């Protein structure tokens, strides 16, 4: 009779921490965001809905009204996301090849090997791809960066975010390794002051324009993207481990098995999309449509692609159910 080992929350947490140590994306997003799972693959994200300020009016009689203006009940926005990635492992340890006892320690060693070589690279590449694709700002560069142009290009992209109200010093600059050399060789980078006692996420190489600089293997970075800037609250990467267990004396073989399953995904928050910005090759950016309104009729013109629109002011890129 096979014996199943179910690994507790403490062991799962230790593996999650191990994943985060070397992940290039785990430090970039907010892990404490207000999220609620519905079933195994739907997650709801809640955010306080803010309104415009009132004008204090001293001429209002307090017995008949409020000098503070209209009373508005505090509400929230709820965003619903569907987890599309459902990955699994089913690995066997044949008794003829295994002299060690199969237990939590053995399972942990196997899982750490898979985290290093398979799971972490896959998740990092997927997250970067989704965040870059769904970013609120895409800037096309006329030519690939060089050591004489990259500094100005990074500052211009960062300024575009700040102009949209994004916090100045809360972002991470992701840059492909094949472009990092141009930043490091730029005169402005060479002349930067020492970071002193600042603590930076492991694997980062410094700060520039208030941004933590995170190099990424060119193989993990999306094609036609040179660099990207992400602010923590603008990107999320929800996940849920559904199964993690060891099976001793498996009925299907003379040995033991380790089974793992995880559902996950990555998204850009619709109302904070300006906190995700990407510098791309010109060929990778869709031209912005033009809208002309005359006599109550809107005419939309676009050079390419399919144009989606909404009637309530929401962004059709993220709320596809309401887009037309």
Feature locations, PLM:
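Short helix/loop capping segments that flank catalytic or ligand/cofactor-binding pockets
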Residues: 53-56, 91-92, 182-185, 269
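Long, hydrophobic/aromatic-enriched structural stretches that serve as scaffold segments
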Residues: 70-109
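Alpha-helical scaffold segments that mediate packing/assembly in large oligomeric complexes
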Residues: 95-164
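Extended, compositionally biased alpha-helical segments that mediate assembly or anchoring
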Residues: 242-289
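Acidic Ser/Thr/Pro-rich low-complexity disordered segments
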Residues: 57-60, 190-193, 314-324
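Short, compositionally stereotyped local motifs that mark structural "simplifiers"
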Residues: 282-324
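Extended oligomerization regions of viral-like shell subunits
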Residues: 39, 44, 161-246
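N-terminal "assembly arms/tails" that initiate or stabilize quaternary assembly
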Residues: 1-81
């Amino acid at each position: 009779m096979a014996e199943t080992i179910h690994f507790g929350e403490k062991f799962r947490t230790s593996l999650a921490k191990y994943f985060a140590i070397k992940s290039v994306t785990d430090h970039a997003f907010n892990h404490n965001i207000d999220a609620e799972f519905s079933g195994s693959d739907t997650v709801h994200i809640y955010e306080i809905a803010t309104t415009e300020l009132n004008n204090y009016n001293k001429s209002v009689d307090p017995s008949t009204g409020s000098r503070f203006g209209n009373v508005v009940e505090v509400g929230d926005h709820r965003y619903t996301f569907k987890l599309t990635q459902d990955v699994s492992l089913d690995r066997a340890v044949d008794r003829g090849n295994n002299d060690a006892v199969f237990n939590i320690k053995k399972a942990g060693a196997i899982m750490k090997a898979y985290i290093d070589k398979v799971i972490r690279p896959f998740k990092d590449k997927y997250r970067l791809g989704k965040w870059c694709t769904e970013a609120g700002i895409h800037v096309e560069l006329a030519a690939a960066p060089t050591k004489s142009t990259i500094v100005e290009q990074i500052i211009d992209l960062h300024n575009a975010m700040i102009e949209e109200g994004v916090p100045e010093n809360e972002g991470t600059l992701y840059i492909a390794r094949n472009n990092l050399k141009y930043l490091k060789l730029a005169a402005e980078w060479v002349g930067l002051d020492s970071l002193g006692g600042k603590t930076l996420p492991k694997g980062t190489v410094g700060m520039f324009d208030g941004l933590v600089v995170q190099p990424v293997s060119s193989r993990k970075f999306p094609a036609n993207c040179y660099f990207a800037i992400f602010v923590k609250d603008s990107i999320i990467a929800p996940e849920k481990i559904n199964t993690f267990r060891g099976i001793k004396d498996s009925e299907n073989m003379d040995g033991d098995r380790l089974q793992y399953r995880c559902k996950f995904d990555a998204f850009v928050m619709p109302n904070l999309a300006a906190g995700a910005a990407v510098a791309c090759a010109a060929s990778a950016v869709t031209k912005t449509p033009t809208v002309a309104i005359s006599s109550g009729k809107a005419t939309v013109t676009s050079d390419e692609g399919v144009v989606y629109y909404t009637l309530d002011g929401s962004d059709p890129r993220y709320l596809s159910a309401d887009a037309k």
